[in-house]
Amino acid sequence: MEVGFLGLGIMGKAMSMNLLKNGFKVTVWNRTLSKCDELVEHGASVCESPAEVIKKCKYTIAMLSDPCAALSVVFDKGGVLEQICEGKGYIDMSTVDAETSLKINEAITGKGGRFVEGPVSGSKKPAEDGQLIILAAGDKALFEESIPAFDVLGKRSFYLGQVGNGAKMKLIVNMIMGSMMNAFSEGLVLADKSGLSSDTLLDILDLGAMTNPMFKGKGPSMNKSSYPPAFPLKHQQKDMRLALALGDENAVSMPVAAAANEAFKKARSLGLGDLDFSAVIEAVKFSRE
């Protein structure tokens, strides 16, 4: 199976590498073309524009940083729309809002192409291990045709119906994750300021009902003030903002998420946006100094 892949950031690079390792022919594009070099060493082909990738491949996957990037790749000069046509499938796995997905869907289908949104739950390590959770919506036939690729990229794929539902589900998942991370950060800081061992707190949490992979995986490095970026904080804050907008649309009160968003915004103002989202703990520390 031959696929195109647009966007080689932390997630896109790991995902496209998995496709290559599992026998897929992969043609890649990235705005900074030098990021394609390692994938070329593993057998990927490179195109100089998204349009060229679409022209070459029946199926093209995109994994981009935000709604602006997702729209740019589709609508700008040399973009997806220049070559999308009947028989072509476009799978956008970026985390965007439902409005952005709907706009892309309308443009793709208006040219005769087929569209699936497929945002993922999971960060760098699950992407490298092929253990993402795929939250797909849109063209059902294209979803089913994409299963061989999805099975390489993730441990389970959900089909959620019409376009927009995948985006909404992803934002809700990330809103919960961000709120949990902020509460977790407050707990670690509170333990430390109370004269208790935050490492002991991790052990206690791991033995009880609140045990989870995020606390177990992030806690030790947070206690060492180390935040290698698996999921950049700036993207977590973007998702919190979009989730709060979804709450506004549906008249859902979300004070916990709103407070967490403020902490992530504070962390960004401290210059921590490119670090892992667990660096939000530094904003919690700052607020208590």
UniProtKB/Swiss-Prot annotation:
Activity modulation notes: The ratio of NADPH/NADP(+) may regulate enzymatic activity.
Give me the residues that bind NADP(+), please. 4-18, 95, 238
Q: Which GO terms describe its molecular function?
A: 3-hydroxybutyrate dehydrogenase activity; glyoxylate reductase (NADPH) activity; NAD binding; NADP binding
Q: Which residues cross the membrane?
A: none
SUPFAM superfamilies noted in UniProt:
6-phosphogluconate dehydrogenase C-terminal domain-like (SSF48179), NAD(P)-binding Rossmann-fold domains (SSF51735)
Q: Which reaction does it catalyse?
A: glycolate + NADP(+) = glyoxylate + NADPH + H(+); 4-hydroxybutanoate + NADP(+) = succinate semialdehyde + NADPH + H(+)
Q: Which biological processes are named by the entry's GO terms?
A: response to oxidative stress
Localized where? Cytoplasm, Cytosol
Pfam families noted in UniProt: NAD_binding_11, NAD_binding_2
Q: What induces it?
A: By salinity, drought, submergence, cold and heat stresses, and ozone.
Source organism superkingdom: Eukaryota
A GO CC annotation given for this chain: cytosol
Q: Which residues are annotated as active site?
A: K170
- Tell me which UniProt keywords the record has, alphabetically: Acetylation, Cytoplasm, NAD, NADP, Oxidoreductase, Stress response
What family is this protein classified in? Belongs to the HIBADH-related family. NP60 subfamily.
Report the function annotation for this chain.
Catalyzes the NADPH-dependent reduction of glyoxylate to glycolate as well as succinic semialdehyde (SSA) to gamma-hydroxybutyrate in vitro. May function in redox homeostasis and play a role in oxidative stress tolerance by detoxifying glyoxylate and SSA generated in glycolate metabolism and GABA metabolism, respectively.
What more does the entry say? Follows a sequentially ordered Bi-Bi catalytic mechanism involving the complexation of NADPH to the enzyme before glyoxylate or SSA, and the release of NADP(+) before glycolate or gamma-hydroxybutyrate, respectively. Although GLYR1 acts as an aldo/keto reductase, it has no significant homology with either mammalian and bacterial NADPH-dependent SSA reductases.
Give the protein name, as stated in the record. Answer: Glyoxylate/succinic semialdehyde reductase 1
